[in-house]
Design a protein with these regions (language model features):
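N-terminal, cleavable Sec-dependent signal peptides of secreted/periplasmic/extracellular proteins
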Residues: 1-174
Length: 174
């Protein structure tokens, strides 16, 4: 329906219309053609194993993922807002850059797909995703997704005033 709506908008824009009506039509066209990007990932990924992210998008042909490795746990835990992420990536080089073609049928609809990530060694990472090849503070849609790569999982229980901790291997359960 969006494709038909754009055709109708193009037809209407070629006619003599009031400024108010033309503004409404232009707003609808902008809404339909607007790009959208959401990226979801697991916060803890397996060590040296293929992982994936879920990408929800609209009107985007290519997804650029920039992966930054964070060596310091305190710095990793400090990254809580977009401005802090931007400050961090300004001073770092990406550990890896992935360019992924997304299915775009030209019909202005929302789509969801999974994108495979490469294997990662144990550590702390930030995935920066955008439909722009160069990411700055002015890039319209940038997503920051921190994640940890580890095979260790912590399970804890509280009994009265005692705390019981268990470290488990996520793959073996031992």
């Amino acid at each position: 329906y969006f494709k038909q709506a754009i055709e109708l908008i193009d037809t209407l824009k070629s006619q003599v219309l009031s400024k108010e009506l033309l503004d409404q039509i232009s707003a609808q066209e902008k809404y339909i053609k607007n790009k959208r990007l959401l990226v979801f990932n697991e916060p803890i990924l397996y060590n040296e194993q293929h992982n994936k992210i879920l990408v929800d998008f609209k009107n985007i042909d290519t997804l650029y993922n920039f992966i930054y490795k964070v060596d310091d746990l305190q710095k990793f835990n400090h990254l809580k807002s977009d401005s802090l992420y931007f400050n961090y990536i300004k001073s770092q080089q990406p550990f890896q850059v992935l360019e992924t073609a997304l299915p775009n049928h030209g019909d202005y609809n929302n789509y969801t797909t999974e994108v495979l990530l490469p294997d990662f060694s144990q550590g702390y990472y930030v995935l920066v995703s955008s439909y722009e090849k160069n990411v700055t503070e002015n890039t319209p849609s940038v997503r920051f997704n921190p994640f940890v790569v580890s095979d260790v999982f912590i399970v804890y229980k509280e009994f009265n005033e005692n705390l019981e901790l268990q470290l488990l291997n996520r793959k073996t359960g031992k």
